[in-house]
Design a protein with these regions (language model features):
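A C-terminal functional module that forms or caps the active site or interfaces directly
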Residues: 189-237, 241
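Conserved N-terminal beta1-alpha1 strand-loop-helix module at the mouth
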Residues: 1-60, 65-87, 250, 256-271
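Conserved, mostly hydrophobic/aromatic
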Residues: 20, 58, 93, 119, ...
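Short amphipathic alpha-helices and their capping/turn segments at secondary-structure boundaries
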Residues: 1-14, 48, 127-136, 219-228
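Conserved anion-binding
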Residues: 98-186, 204
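Active-site beta-loop-alpha junctions enriched in small/polar residues
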Residues: 21-27, 63-65, 95-99, 124, ...
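Short, well-ordered coil/turn segments that N-cap beta-strands
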Residues: 14-18, 53-56, 86-88, 117, ...
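N-terminal active-site wall of soluble small-molecule enzyme domains
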Residues: 62-112, 191-194
Length: 271
């Protein structure tokens, strides 16, 4: 099956549009896992066990692992999800963007080394930097469009030929870059009006939506403005708000409660 088939099946099975970001920070880990040989993996394992029936996908951010030499724990985490949360796909958040020959190696890294089901990429350098990822037709390729960070508008909101750059990106994805039906875009929850405009521009394109939880995005606006006509089409990501919901030995149960609360809040606004 393809990434989007698996993601939609998980969303239906778990009645959930929640994506959990697995972004461990050693300083914030509960004391009960800090002493483990692989503390990031043990932490992630507990989070996955507690939330796998509440989510549509997981999204580890690779920098949290690579920054401290724990790529082996990233790989172990993805393997664990595939084995113990079957049918719940994994987005590797790396935001790659480089010339074609280098992009080929980044695509191999994401899809062959890590066996991720989807990847985030940066379109700034154009289609030839995205093609190596898009050529993996059964994998998801999630393209940065309108991002949640405060200064994203420095470039994304610049107007060219009457449209902001982020709308040009969305149109390229919709009209030219999605030949395999495996593309999506990243649209931040912190810009709900732009989210609404992009949904009108791309009625069926899946959106990965970061920025709820710790970043303060409005869940109601995300759902009302971002869902497709069938009440789907969104992967609403929360990282810190779920994985660091608790600090003690019961951290996994706290993460479950946080994921369930977000799922139920989202569902209360779905059509």
């Amino acid at each position: 099956m393809s990434f989007f088939s698996d993601m939609n099946a998980a969303a239906d099975r778990n009645n959930s549009l929640v994506c959990v970001g697995l972004d461990p920070d050693f300083k914030k880990l509960p004391e009960c896992v800090k002493g483990a040989a692989k503390p990031f993996f043990e932490f992630n394992k507990a989070i996955v066990d507690a939330t796998r029936d509440l989510v549509s996908c997981y999204k580890p951010q690779a920098a949290y692992y690579a920054g401290c030499g724990r790529e082996d724990e990233l790989l172990a985490t993805i393997e664990y999800i595939h084995e113990n949360a079957p049918g719940v796909p994994v987005i590797l958040d790396v935001k790659r963007g480089d010339i074609g020959s280098t992009a080929e190696q980044y695509a191999r890294e994401a899809f062959e080394r890590y066996n991720a089901d989807a990847v985030t990429v940066n379109p700034y350098m154009g289609y030839d930097t995205l093609k190596p990822f898009l050529d993996y037709a059964d994998k998801g390729v999630i393209i940065l469009c309108r991002i949640s960070n405060p200064n994203s508008g420095d470039l994304q909101s610049l107007v060219c030929d009457g449209l902001p750059i982020y709308k040009h990106v969305a149109k390229l994805v919709r009209d030219k870059w999605n030949a395999n039906g495996n593309a999506a875009i990243v649209v931040g929850a912190t810009y709900p009006e732009e989210l609404q405009e992009l949904r009108q521009l791309c009625p069926e394109l899946p959106f990965l939506v970061p920025g709820v939880g710790a970043q303060g995005g409005d869940v109601e606006k995300v759902v009302r403005f971002g869902c497709t006509a069938d009440g789907k089409g969104l992967m609403i990501n929360s990282s810190r708000g779920i994985i660091f919901a608790g600090k003690d030995d019961d951290f996994a149960e706290a993460s479950r409660k946080a994921a369930m609360a977000l799922r139920d809040q989202i569902n209360s606004f779905r059509k």
